[in-house]
Regions:
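N-terminal secretory signal peptides
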Residues: 28-87
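N-terminal secretory signal peptides that target proteins for export/translocation
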Residues: 1-7
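Mid-chain, structured segments of secreted extracytoplasmic proteins
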Residues: 72-114
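Bacterial N-terminal signal peptides
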Residues: 10-23
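An exposed acidic His-Trp-rich patch
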Residues: 103-143
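Aromatic-rich beta-strand edge motifs centered on tyrosine
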Residues: 69-72, 95-97, 130-136
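Short, surface-exposed coil-to-beta transition loops
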Residues: 63-67, 88-93, 124-129
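C-terminal partner/receptor-binding element of secreted or periplasmic proteins
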Residues: 135-172
C-alpha cells in the first residue's frame, strides 16, 4: 500500500511538474511572438511614408460612420487607420497586417456621457485602450488598459469584434 501511495504521489508530482514546464514554455513562445509583432509594427510605421495611402468612408463598421486610411506597399496591405463613430462613443483604430493577416490592432475608445445629437454636447467620461496581438491567425494576447484578458465573455466579445472590424475594413 505504501509503495502504491509513493508511486501515485510520484506520478502526481511529475504531472504537476510537466504541466508547469509546458505552461512556462508556452508563455516564452508567446513572448517571442509578441517581440516579433512589435518589431514588424515598428517597421511598418517606419516605412509608412513610402506606402500608397488611400482614405475613404467605410459602411457597416460603426453606426455613425467610419473613415479609414489604407496603407499599401505594392499590392500588400500593411496598415489601416480608422476613425469610428457611434451614438455614445468615438474610437480610433490601427490595424497592422503581414502577408494579408492581421498581426496587431490598437483601439482607443472614448465613451460619451450621452448620445450625440442631444441638446448638450456629449462629454468624454472614459477612455479605454485595447491591444490585440495575433500570430498565425490566432489571438495570442489581449490587453484592455494594462490588464491582460485571457478568457470570459468580455474576451470573446472583444475578440469577435476586432476580427469583424478588421475584416470589414479589409474587404471595403
Amino acid at each position: 500500500m505504501k509503495i502504491l501511495l509513493n508511486k501515485s504521489l510520484c506520478f502526481l508530482l511529475s504531472g504537476i511538474f510537466l504541466t508547469f514546464i509546458f505552461a512556462v514554455s508556452a508563455q516564452a513562445q508567446t513572448e517571442k511572438e509578441i517581440v516579433k509583432i512589435r518589431a514588424e509594427v515598428a517597421a511598418i510605421n517606419k516605412g509608412v511614408s513610402k506606402y500608397t495611402k488611400t482614405t475613404k468612408d467605410v459602411e457597416d463598421v460603426s453606426l455613425e460612420g467610419t473613415e479609414a486610411t489604407f496603407y499599401h506597399s505594392a499590392k500588400n496591405l500593411k496598415k489601416i487607420t480608422a476613425k469610428m463613430y457611434g451614438e455614445t462613443y468615438n474610437q480610433t483604430g490601427e490595424f497592422y497586417y503581414q502577408n494579408g493577416e492581421l498581426i496587431f490592432a490598437f483601439i482607443k475608445r472614448n465613451q460619451y456621457d450621452t448620445q450625440i445629437g442631444m441638446d448638450a454636447p456629449p462629454k468624454v467620461v472614459s477612455t479605454e485602450e485595447r491591444r490585440f496581438y495575433f500570430a498565425n491567425g490566432e489571438l495570442i494576447r489581449m490587453l484592455v488598459g494594462k490588464k491582460e484578458l485571457k478568457t470570459g465573455e468580455k474576451y470573446s466579445e472583444l475578440k469577435d469584434e476586432i476580427i469583424s472590424v478588421s475584416g470589414k475594413l479589409k474587404d471595403s
